[in-house]
Structures are given as structure tokens and as C-alpha cells.
């Protein structure tokens, strides 16, 4: 072993880093284990990559040896995490090496032939694509473009999502493609679009070091964004005047730092938000100059339903469901009158939060001297009125002018590593195109068709099936060929018993799942395709602060596993244009006759124009080698054409391999920290100060939106609220983290967190097994009354990482009618001893 000498200065740095690491859930000994990053000293090759897990976008240093990742540590050159990792990030080196890693395509067969009820049998890629192409062509003949679909991911790399969107929206001419970001970020997208006319946060992580107060709305940052939480903690502990307010339906680890901790009754966040706005108006703290110059007022459509099936009684009663996204102009006076009924006193009574705490919270926003950052995640977004929650928190920041400047920021935190970069920016949602364009807008479709070199009318003008609707259509037999990549929706989707699983096993359907491991979803499929993971391919993610980050391929995938990008592009070779486009469309561009979708979409003179010698020396690139050109650069530069000059500018391709990410818009080589603010955002006109240029009038919208009840509430038969969510040790459905021994042992199985008094009343003790049952299904779990999560009486919390306890058999598939995002935080259950 090579001797190392560490001087006093280095030792002090290590001690400081160890303290911060402990706050992130990482054992202090882990830091010393990964200190040596020079190849000469360690005989390892080190390179940078974006972390595979959450939307924080930490950069990590990855060590490889003999075609294997052997170590990782936080990247000290990264602005985001400054050398730190959370407990999941610390074990990144192990996520690719589970004992049951998939290495060959697997097709259900009986007696050598495909059989929906057969056993999984290894097959070649050719055989896998043959049966897959046959089933897709059958579905296209039977139902047209609506018969095929795809469910993708906020964990796709940017070019994987872009290639998938092209294949389905342009190739198969269907918008039936949606990412699992529909479950996590759709309400944030719709909220931004409604308020600002353009997507993604105005601020950045630099706001943390400039803020005087932090307000968390439905966000357990301590566990879900632990590295950002270390920065919030550092700010709070190093500046005595700084305050932290945390609002949630149950107490969790973020409450440990809270100066103002508030547990509110589910759904009453709507009431609280309006009450704060009313307080600002009543106490004369509206920033009148800002409001007059930069905002207009709207009254939103109400009684919009809950996104349930049309025959559901709640949908039948919803008078505004058909026009859920509509709004009409009102004046400031009309808005002030609307919120005047929402007093802090009534809010306290409605929510159960003590009045003095609500007053303290309202004053953080109202005091013009206090800079406030509002953070929120799934508590807001997974909500039947999630878009409204987003709009209402923007209202507060707009009324006070606390936006688009250092320390003043309403900030929706992203859950997945590229929910922003791939789902939102690339536009892999069923209604979107790149750079905030939508399929319903003819000008947007025309621009996309021009960049993609397609005949006019190629892209359909109606949104496709969104995530929840895909499950319903599969069940109903109206969506027959379906491809799932980089997600585990049978475990993650709501109401799994009634709405998700039936579609997978419908004999009329053919289900393909691309995954690295045999997940619950993969095991319910007809064909499993083995997938390359993380640094087994060249990649790019976009994080929550608009930061785009690249990494090189560092190792090869095992066996016959191939990247999702390779799968998409290789599969496209199986389709002649005549098999997927109507004759009248082909007639508009006759030179496509006889070509494959691969030729038209990916070997089109744009994507394939960069030769292999442009790949940086010393790095493998399996996808590019397979196709004969630098795939990633070609896809990226074509995609970047959508945003350049339109407020979504990306830097040249090579810049991202050199940098630890850049925050768009990147104009003349300079990234943007604060959008909409003159001097920071190059799109703001000189002399305007602030310009919300997403709308032609340059103004943001302030919405009058009421409290409306949840889709389902506790009653005598089902007396408890159920909320679901995550824990720091596991990522989403646990497909990766449960295969890391240290993370599995740290939290081996999901439990039912319950108030001790509720348990005592039911004659239950900690560790007893109970049935958590709703009107839709049940699971068994053990009671936890002394854990990190502390629900109030009448509410239980069950995390969803555990495939042996599929809590989404219990949840309700109600969605926000505007964003179409599922509410996983509120349904009614009963707790029974087993």
C-alpha cells in the first residue's frame, strides 16, 4: 500500500468534511476510504459522473479498474455537493453488481414458442426484436398509432429520452409516451407554465447561502435531498437570524432543524397558502410597485374533479372538469376580496396548526427585509390540487416581490436525476415537445417537424395517454404494444390491483420491460430486455437548478446488456416507413420511401454527422461504435437547436465534458443563475428589471384558487389517512438500493409508521404485524411507533421501496386534473391486526 502524508491543513479539511458527511447520513470513516484519487497513487482510473439517484445533481468521482467500478466519492470540484455524498451516493459503486443482474433478453415461452403464460427463457437480441416488432406492427394494424405506447423515465439520459420521443412522436406517430416524472413533477411543470408561461425554477442552489428563511412545503429534504439539506443546515447554524419552517402532514427528520414546525391536516395546505396571501394584503406588505409592473390576476376554474375514470361518481359531479386549466381575468381588488375569507384564525382551525405558528410563518413572507426560499416536492406535487399549490406559493412570492434574486426564490425540488433534463426539457411527456413546446400548438409541431426533417403533419395534434391513462387503456385492451424503460411502475403506479396489473396480463397486450434487474414490473412483462446502467454508457442528466451534466462511458455492461439508447435506435431498424406512415404523408416527402425509421430519424444527415474520431480519446462508447457515428453528440446538437435563441440555450457539446455542469440558458458561454432578472438573465430586456418573458406581456399570473376537499377522506370504515413516500436509504422502488447489502441492512423492510396512542387504542405494540387495507387492496407490515417518522393521530405513513409490501395496491388513482399527476399522499385505510 502506498504511504500517504497528510498535513494539518488537510486534516482540518477532512474533519470539516466528516462533520458535514455525518449530517448527510454517511459514516465518517467512508471519507478516508476514498481520499486517494491520483491514478499513480491508487492504480485506479478516476473520472467524474453525475450521481445516479435524486434530482439534486451531485457530482461524484468514479474509480474503475479492470472494467469494473470499484469506488466512488463526492467530487470536491462540484458546486452542487462540494465533495459530499449522502448515504446512497456513497454506495454507488455497488448498484451495478447485484447477484441477479440481467444479462440476456428473456421471452416468455412454452415449447419453444412465445406464450403469454410461459416461462422466461433466454433469447438472442434478434429473436427479441423480431417478436417485439411483430407485436408492434400487429397493434398498429389493429388500432393505428393509438395502439402502441411507451412509459419512460426521469432517469433516462437526455439523449435516451430524446431518441424515444422521436421514435414514438415522429416514427410511430403517436403521443402515447410519458415519463414516470408524471408521478413526481407534472404539477410543478403545469404550475410554472400557468404562472410564468415557461418551465423550471427561476432560482438556483446559490439562493441557500443568501436566504434569511427557508420554508419547506411537503418536503423532507433531510432524507430526500440530504446534500442540499446540509447546505440549509450550514446556513441555519452559521447565521443566528436565519429561520427554518417545515410544514407536513406528519413529523419527519427535517423537523429536527425547524424553528417553526407545523403538522397540518391533509389537503389544508391550500387553505394555509391563501391565508398567508391574505395576511400580506391585510397588513399592507404587498410590494405594490412590483405587482403593478410585473403581474396580472386570474381566477381559476373550480370544481375540476379528481382525474378518475369518467364513470366515477366524483367525476360525474365535477362541473368544471372539462375546463380545468381555464382562467379568467380579475383585478387586484377582486383577488383581495377572494382571499379575505382565508384568515389565519380560520386556517388554524381548519389545519390544526397553532395560530401563533401560522402568524410566525406568515411574517417570514410578509416582512420585506426577510429573504425567503420556499422548497417543495411531493407533498405539493402528488396532490389532487398540486398545480394549485404551486400557483398559490408563487402568489405569495409575487405579492411580495421575493423572486428571481439571490435568497428570494420559490423552488420546486426535483425527485429524479433528470426529471428536469429529460422529462421536462426534452419534452417526453405525452403533451410536450422540446423546449416547452406542446403538441397541440401547430407552430410548435411545425418547428419540431422542421428540425427533425419531417413532412408537415407527421406529429399528431392531440396529447397521448398519460401515465395513469396508459394503465387504464392497457386494462381496457385499447393499448396493445407497450414498452417500459427505466422505471418500475407496477410497484410505483397507484391502485395497482385494479388498474395497473390487469393491463400487463391482458392477453391482448404485449409488454416489454427494459431493466437491469428483475423488478416487479419486469416479472409481469412478456419480454425483458437487459439494460446497461449509469457509467456503462455515456450519459447526461439535468438537475433541479437547470444544470446539465455529462459523463463518459467508464466500463462495459455485463453479458448482452445494452443501453436504452441502443435498444431504441436498433429497434427502429425493424420498421419500413411504409409500415408506419400513411401514403399521403409519404407523398409529401417521397425520398423516405423504402427507408427504415432508423434512416429517417437517426441517420438523417444531422444525428449521424459526427464521426467516431470526435469521441474523446481514452473512452469507450459502445452505442456509437455499434452505429458507426458519435450518436450522443449528434442527438444532443439536434436537440439543442430547439432551445437556442428561445430561452433554453445549451452550451456546445464539448463544454459539458469539461465542466461540472452548466445552468441554462447558457449564452455566449455564460450560465444563468437567476432567471427573469436583469443582469443575470440574458433574455431580460434592458431597463425592465424583471421580465417574465414566458408570456408575451412579460408578466406573471397570480391566481385566485379556493380550498377544495380531497378525493377520499377517512370515515368509520376506513378511519386513517395513508401517506406514502421514501426513506433516505432507498431510491424509489429499491430496485438498485435493496441490492446494496449495507443499504438493505440499514432499512430492510417497509413498516407502518403510526402514532403510539393510535396503536395503544387498537391494542397494538411496536413490531406487531398489521394489515393496511383500503377499498382497493391491502398489504401487511409491522407497526413502528418510535421511528424517525412521527405521524399525528389518525394518519399512517408507509414507504414504497419494498417490493414485498406493495403499498400502491392500497393507494387511489386520483390525479390532479390539470397536471394528471397522482396523489399518493391521501387515501383512507383501516389498520387491522394480522
Curated annotation (Swiss-Prot):
<feature type="signal peptide" description="Tat-type signal">
    <location>
        <begin position="1"/>
        <end position="32"/>
    </location>
</feature>
<keyword id="KW-0574">Periplasm</keyword>
<keyword id="KW-0500">Molybdenum</keyword>
<keyword id="KW-0408">Iron</keyword>
<dbReference type="GO" id="GO:0016020">
    <property type="term" value="C:membrane"/>
</dbReference>
<comment type="subunit">
    <text>Component of the periplasmic nitrate reductase NapAB complex composed of NapA and NapB.</text>
</comment>
<dbReference type="GO" id="GO:0045333">
    <property type="term" value="P:cellular respiration"/>
</dbReference>
<feature type="binding site">
    <location>
        <begin position="217"/>
        <end position="224"/>
    </location>
    <ligand>
        <name>Mo-bis(molybdopterin guanine dinucleotide)</name>
    </ligand>
</feature>
<feature type="binding site">
    <location>
        <begin position="267"/>
        <end position="269"/>
    </location>
    <ligand>
        <name>Mo-bis(molybdopterin guanine dinucleotide)</name>
    </ligand>
</feature>
<feature type="binding site">
    <location>
        <begin position="248"/>
        <end position="252"/>
    </location>
    <ligand>
        <name>Mo-bis(molybdopterin guanine dinucleotide)</name>
    </ligand>
</feature>
<feature type="binding site">
    <location>
        <position position="488"/>
    </location>
    <ligand>
        <name>Mo-bis(molybdopterin guanine dinucleotide)</name>
    </ligand>
</feature>
<dbReference type="InterPro" id="IPR010051">
    <property type="entry name" value="Periplasm_NO3_reductase_lsu"/>
</dbReference>
<feature type="binding site">
    <location>
        <position position="86"/>
    </location>
    <ligand>
        <name>[4Fe-4S] cluster</name>
    </ligand>
</feature>
<feature type="binding site">
    <location>
        <position position="537"/>
    </location>
    <ligand>
        <name>Mo-bis(molybdopterin guanine dinucleotide)</name>
    </ligand>
</feature>
<feature type="binding site">
    <location>
        <position position="58"/>
    </location>
    <ligand>
        <name>[4Fe-4S] cluster</name>
    </ligand>
</feature>
<feature type="binding site">
    <location>
        <position position="378"/>
    </location>
    <ligand>
        <name>Mo-bis(molybdopterin guanine dinucleotide)</name>
    </ligand>
</feature>
<feature type="binding site">
    <location>
        <position position="564"/>
    </location>
    <ligand>
        <name>Mo-bis(molybdopterin guanine dinucleotide)</name>
    </ligand>
</feature>
<keyword id="KW-0813">Transport</keyword>
<dbReference type="InterPro" id="IPR006311">
    <property type="entry name" value="TAT_signal"/>
</dbReference>
<dbReference type="GO" id="GO:0042128">
    <property type="term" value="P:nitrate assimilation"/>
</dbReference>
<feature type="binding site">
    <location>
        <position position="800"/>
    </location>
    <ligand>
        <name>substrate</name>
    </ligand>
</feature>
<dbReference type="GO" id="GO:0006777">
    <property type="term" value="P:Mo-molybdopterin cofactor biosynthetic process"/>
</dbReference>
<keyword id="KW-0732">Signal</keyword>
<dbReference type="InterPro" id="IPR041957">
    <property type="entry name" value="CT_Nitrate-R-NapA-like"/>
</dbReference>
<dbReference type="GO" id="GO:0030151">
    <property type="term" value="F:molybdenum ion binding"/>
</dbReference>
<feature type="binding site">
    <location>
        <position position="825"/>
    </location>
    <ligand>
        <name>Mo-bis(molybdopterin guanine dinucleotide)</name>
    </ligand>
</feature>
<dbReference type="Pfam" id="PF04879">
    <property type="entry name" value="Molybdop_Fe4S4"/>
</dbReference>
<dbReference type="GO" id="GO:0042597">
    <property type="term" value="C:periplasmic space"/>
</dbReference>
<feature type="binding site">
    <location>
        <begin position="514"/>
        <end position="515"/>
    </location>
    <ligand>
        <name>Mo-bis(molybdopterin guanine dinucleotide)</name>
    </ligand>
</feature>
<keyword id="KW-0560">Oxidoreductase</keyword>
<comment type="similarity">
    <text>Belongs to the prokaryotic molybdopterin-containing oxidoreductase family. NasA/NapA/NarB subfamily.</text>
</comment>
<dbReference type="InterPro" id="IPR009010">
    <property type="entry name" value="Asp_de-COase-like_dom_sf"/>
</dbReference>
<comment type="function">
    <text>Catalytic subunit of the periplasmic nitrate reductase complex NapAB. Receives electrons from NapB and catalyzes the reduction of nitrate to nitrite.</text>
</comment>
<keyword id="KW-0004">4Fe-4S</keyword>
<feature type="binding site">
    <location>
        <position position="88"/>
    </location>
    <ligand>
        <name>Mo-bis(molybdopterin guanine dinucleotide)</name>
    </ligand>
</feature>
<dbReference type="InterPro" id="IPR006657">
    <property type="entry name" value="MoPterin_dinucl-bd_dom"/>
</dbReference>
<feature type="binding site">
    <location>
        <position position="180"/>
    </location>
    <ligand>
        <name>Mo-bis(molybdopterin guanine dinucleotide)</name>
    </ligand>
</feature>
<feature type="binding site">
    <location>
        <position position="51"/>
    </location>
    <ligand>
        <name>[4Fe-4S] cluster</name>
    </ligand>
</feature>
<dbReference type="InterPro" id="IPR006656">
    <property type="entry name" value="Mopterin_OxRdtase"/>
</dbReference>
<dbReference type="GO" id="GO:0043546">
    <property type="term" value="F:molybdopterin cofactor binding"/>
</dbReference>
<feature type="binding site">
    <location>
        <begin position="724"/>
        <end position="733"/>
    </location>
    <ligand>
        <name>Mo-bis(molybdopterin guanine dinucleotide)</name>
    </ligand>
</feature>
<feature type="binding site">
    <location>
        <position position="54"/>
    </location>
    <ligand>
        <name>[4Fe-4S] cluster</name>
    </ligand>
</feature>
Amino acid at each position: 500500500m502506498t504511504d500517504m502524508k497528510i498535513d494539518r491543513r488537510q486534516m482540518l479539511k477532512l474533519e470539516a468534511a466528516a462533520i458535514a458527511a455525518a449530517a448527510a447520513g454517511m459514516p465518517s470513516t467512508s471519507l478516508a476510504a476514498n481520499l486517494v484519487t491520483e491514478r499513480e497513487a491508487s492504480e485506479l482510473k478516476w473520472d467524474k459522473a453525475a450521481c445516479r439517484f435524486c434530482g439534486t445533481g451531485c457530482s461524484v468521482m468514479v474509480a474503475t479498474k479492470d472494467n469494473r467500478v470499484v469506488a466512488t466519492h463526492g467530487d470536491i470540484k462540484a458546486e452542487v455537493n462540494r465533495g459530499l455524498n449522502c448515504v446512497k451516493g456513497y454506495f454507488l459503486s455497488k448498484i451495478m453488481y447485484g447477484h441477479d443482474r440481467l444479462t440476456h433478453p428473456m421471452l416468455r415461452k412454452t415449447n419453444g414458442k412465445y406464450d403469454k403464460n410461459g416461462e422466461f427463457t433466454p433469447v438472442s437480441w434478434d429473436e427479441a426484436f423480431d417478436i417485439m416488432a411483430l407485436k408492434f406492427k400487429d397493434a398498429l394494424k389493429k388500432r393505428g398509432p393509438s395502439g402502441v405506447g411507451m412509459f419512460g423515465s426521469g432517469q433516462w439520459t437526455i439523449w435516451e429520452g430524446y431518441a424515444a420521443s422521436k421514435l414514438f412522436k415522429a416514427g410511430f406517430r403517436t403521443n402515447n409516451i410519458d415519463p414516470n416524472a408524471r408521478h413526481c413533477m407534472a404539477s410543478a411543470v403545469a404550475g410554472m407554465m400557468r404562472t410564468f408561461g415557461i418551465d423550471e425554477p427561476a432560482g438556483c442552489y446559490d439562493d441557500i447561502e443568501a436566504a434569511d428563511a427557508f420554508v419547506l412545503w411537503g418536503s423532507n429534504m433531510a432524507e430526500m435531498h440530504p446534500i442540499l439539506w446540509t447546505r440549509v443546515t450550514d446556513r441555519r447554524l452559521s447565521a443566528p437570524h436565519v429561520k427554518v419552517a417545515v410544514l407536513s402532514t406528519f413529523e419527519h427528520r427535517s423537523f429536527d432543524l425547524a424553528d417553526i414546525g407545523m403538522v397540518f391536516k391533509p389537503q389544508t395546505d391550500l387553505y394555509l397558502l391563501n391565508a398567508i396571501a391574505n395576511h400580506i394584503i391585510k397588513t399592507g406588505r404587498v410590494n405594490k410597485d412590483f405587482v403593478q409592473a410585473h403581474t396580472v390576476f386570474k381566477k381559476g376554474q373550480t370544481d375540476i374533479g379528481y382525474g378518475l375514470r369518467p364513470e366515477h361518481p366524483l367525476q360525474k359531479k365535477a362541473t368544471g372538469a372539462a375546463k380545468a386549466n381555464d382562467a379568467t381575468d380579475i383585478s387586484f381588488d377582486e383577488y383581495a376580496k377572494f382571499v379575505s375569507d382565508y384568515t389565519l384564525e380560520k386556517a388554524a382551525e381548519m389545519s390544526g396548526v397553532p395560530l401563533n405558528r401560522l402568524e410566525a410563518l406568515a411574517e417570514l413572507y410578509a416582512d420585506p427585509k426577510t429573504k425567503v426560499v420556499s422548497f417543495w416536492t411531493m407533498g405539493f406535487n402528488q396532490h389532487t390540487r398540486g398545480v394549485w399549490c404551486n400557483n398559490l406559493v408563487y402568489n405569495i412570492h409575487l405579492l411580495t416581490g421575493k423572486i428571481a434574486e439571490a435568497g428570494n426564490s420559490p423552488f420546486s425540488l426535483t425527485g429524479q436525476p433528470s426529471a428536469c433534463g429529460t422529462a421536462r426539457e426534452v419534452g417526453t411527456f405525452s403533451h410536450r415537445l422540446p423546449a416547452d413546446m406542446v403538441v397541440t400548438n401547430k407552430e410548435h409541431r411545425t418547428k419540431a417537424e422542421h428540425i427533425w426533417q419531417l413532412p408537415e403533419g407527421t406529429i399528431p395534434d392531440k396529447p397521448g395517454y398519460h401515465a395513469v391513462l396508459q394503465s387504464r387503456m392497457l386494462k381496457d385492451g385499447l393499448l396493445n404494444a407497450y414498452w417500459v424503460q427505466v422505471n418500475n411502475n407496477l410497484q410505483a403506479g397507484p391502485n395497482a390491483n385494479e388498474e395497473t396489473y390487469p393491463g400487463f396480463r391482458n392477453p391482448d397486450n404485449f409488454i416489454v420491460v427494459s431493466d437491469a434487474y428483475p423488478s416487479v414490473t419486469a416479472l409481469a412483462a412478456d419480454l425483458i430486455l437487459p439494460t446497461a446502467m449509469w457509467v456503462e454508457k455515456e450519459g447526461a442528466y439535468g438537475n433541479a437548478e437547470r444544470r446539465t451534466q455529462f459523463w463518459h462511458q467508464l466500463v462495459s455492461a455485463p453479458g448482452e446488456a445494452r443501453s436504452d439508447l441502443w435498444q431504441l435506435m436498433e429497434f427502429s431498424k425493424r420498421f419500413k416507413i411504409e409500415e408506419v406512415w400513411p401514403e399521403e404523408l409519404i407523398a409529401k416527402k417521397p425520398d423516405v420511401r423504402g427507408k427504415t425509421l432508423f434512416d429517417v430519424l437517426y441517420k438523417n444527415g444531422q444525428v449521424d454527422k459526427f464521426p467516431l474520431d470526435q469521441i474523446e480519446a481514452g473512452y469507450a462508447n459502445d452505442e456509437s461504435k455499434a452505429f458507426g457515428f458519435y450518436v450522443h453528440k449528434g442527438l444532443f446538437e439536434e436537440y439543442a437547436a430547439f432551445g437556442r435563441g428561445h430561452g433554453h440555450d445549451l452550451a456546445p457539446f464539448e463544454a459539458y465534458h469539461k465542466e461540472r455542469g452548466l445552468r441554462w440558458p447558457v449564452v455566449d458561454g455564460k450560465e444563468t443563475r437567476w432567471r427573469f432578472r436583469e443582469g443575470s438573465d440574458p433574455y431580460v430586456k434592458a431597463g425592465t428589471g424583471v421580465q417574465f418573458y414566458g408570456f408575451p406581456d412579460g408578466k406573471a399570473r397570480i391566481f385566485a384558487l379556493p380550498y377544495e376537499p380531497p378525493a377520499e377522506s377517512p370515515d368509520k370504515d376506513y378511519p386513517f389517512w395513508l401517506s406514502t413516500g421514501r426513506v433516505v436509504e432507498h431510491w424509489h422502488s429499491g430496485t438498485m438500493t435493496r441490492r446494496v447489502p449495507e443499504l438493505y441492512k440499514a432499512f430492510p423492510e417497509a413498516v407502518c409508521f403510526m402514532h403510539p396512542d393510535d396503536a395503544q387504542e387498537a391494542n397494538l405494540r411496536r413490531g406487531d404485524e398489521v394489515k393496511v387495507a383500503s377499498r382497493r387492496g391491502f398489504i401487511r407490515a409491522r407497526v413502528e411507533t418510535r421511528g424517525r417518522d412521527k405521524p399525528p393521530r389518525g394518519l399512517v405513513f408507509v414507504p414504497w421501496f419494498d417490493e414485498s409490501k406493495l403499498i400502491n395496491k392500497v393507494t387511489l388513482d386520483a390525479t390532479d386534473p390539470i397536471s394528471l399527476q397522482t396523489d399518493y399522499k391521501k387515501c383512507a385505510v383501516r389498520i387491522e391486526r394480522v
